[in-house]
A protein has these predicted regions:
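Beta-rich carbohydrate-recognition and catalytic domains
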Residues: 1-73, 77-127, 136-194, 198-253, ...
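Active-site/ligand-binding surface loops and adjacent short beta/alpha elements
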Residues: 260
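Well-ordered alpha/beta subsegment
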Residues: 312, 329-337
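Extended, compositionally biased non-globular segments
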Residues: 323-327
Length: 392
């Protein structure tokens, strides 16, 4: 019979095999990005000593004491030569928290730091915090902006589902010690708030997503833009929409900025999520757009349709048919690591380059917003290619 210590050893060996498994690029693709064979982080990647009491006296059956349900929606940053994700971890109790995992190469061997992030409370404590966007700002701080969820105390008696969403703010110098700042003050509920990495006219710039309720965007027109004077007491006084929602598109129900944009010689590269309604519920996909270098509110490229959508096992999970991103890393050589969650369950990576993503944005046709317009766009490409084919 296997001893307690032997069982513990087997747990650690199995975990180490998962952590060190080499990830493999999936070569067949569309030329824009490369997916990888395995998820980069799952609930099973969390340390054994997070989930099991390793004391035989208090856990003689070696049972899991603290269950982990999912690893999802991660901010990302290059830090001291390592690729770091600040993950949204969800426990079996449904509570989310933040934890850092680091990799030497960005595609595999992600290891969690020993302890999760300790995040202090705002004046009004939040029940749940999640989906952190990281920005290394030119002021010298690394900011994390995340959703802070609380029960809606104005809900009818017995309604234990209604909630409110605000943008929580914290900052750090080392990703270990976090200074909690007051939540962002806004006229509406907010999710998907992202800090622009540079000052604009001497002010901090935020990408926002105003919404009427906890889930529904309602009258919120899309991805917004606001300038604030001080992140230690941030307040949105004026807000304008820079990327609108449109009927019968991949972002008709709602959309939201993903990670902070990447600065390129041609403009700011943006990655966002779009949501549409279908018979199976809400479908989340990723899309891109670009804004002008001298005016980040000015759209200069809006490729039509989605950039990435769920495929294969990505389609299945706690909330199926969903891709979501709030983290990417652009290396100095131009390689881009896109970290995305599938179906609120696991984290993946896809790689591309700045040049490819700019080309995709600049040269993909816009959405004509009707079937007839889409056909005309398709016919133009067919005509061009048929002329080329006759020369072969």
């Amino acid at each position: 019979m296997e001893t307690f210590n032997e069982k513990v050893t087997r747990l650690f060996q199995k975990h180490e095999a998962l952590i060190t498994r080499k990830n493999e690029p999936i070569e067949e693709g569309n030329g824009i990005f490369t997916r990888y064979k395995y998820p980069v982080v799952t609930a099973a990647h969390t340390p054994v000593f997070w989930r099991y009491d390793l004391d035989e006296q208090t856990n003689p059956y070696l049972m899991e004491r603290i269950g982990m349900n999912a690893a999802l929606n991660s901010g990302a940053i290059k830090w001291n030569g390592k690729y770091l994700m600040v993950l949204r971890m969800e426990g079996a109790d449904r509570k989310s928290f933040f934890a850092v995992a680091e990799s030497p190469n960005g595609v595999d061997n992600f290891r969690f730091w020993d302890y999760p992030v300790t995040m202090s409370e705002d004046v009004v404590p939040a029940t749940n915090i999640y989906d952190m966007r990281l920005t290394a700002h030119e002021d010298g701080w690394i900011y994390g902006i995340f959703c802070a969820e609380r029960h809606d105390d104005n809900a009818p008696v017995g309604d234990l589902s209604s909630a409110t969403a605000t943008a929580g703010i914290a900052r750090t110098k080392d990703l270990k010690t976090w200074e909690r700042l007051p939540d962002l003050k806004t006229k509406s509920q907010q999710r998907n708030v992202v800090l622009h990495p540079e000052f604009i006219d001497g002010k901090y710039a935020l990408y926002t997503r105003p919404q009427d309720g906890f889930i529904d965007a309602g009258s919120g027109g899309g991805i917004g833009w606001a300038l604030v004077d001080d992140m230690t007491h941030a307040e949105v006084k004026e807000e304008k929409i820079i990327d609108y929602r449109y009927y019968h598109t991949i972002k008709e129900v709602k959309n939201g900025e993903g990670p902070h944009p990447i600065k390129t010689s041609k403009g700011w590269l943006h990655l966002a999520h779009g949501v549409r309604a279908c018979a199976a519920g809400l479908r989340y996909v990723l899309y891109m757009y670009m804004t002008a270098l001298d005016d980040p509110t000015k759209l200069i490229a809006t490729p039509g349709g989605y950039f990435m959508a769920p495929e294969g096992e990505e389609r299945v999970g706690d909330v199926s048919n969903v891709l979501f991103t709030n983290g990417w890393i652009a290396d100095e050589d131009g390689k881009v690591f896109i970290y995305y969650a599938s179906s609120d369950t696991r984290m993946h990576v896809a790689t591309s380059t700045v040049d490819k993503l700019v080309d995709y944005c600049m040269n993909t046709p816009v959405d004509g917003l009707s079937s007839s317009a889409s056909v005309e766009t398709l016919k133009k490409l067919i005509d061009k290619n048929l002329k080329k084919i006759t020369n072969y």
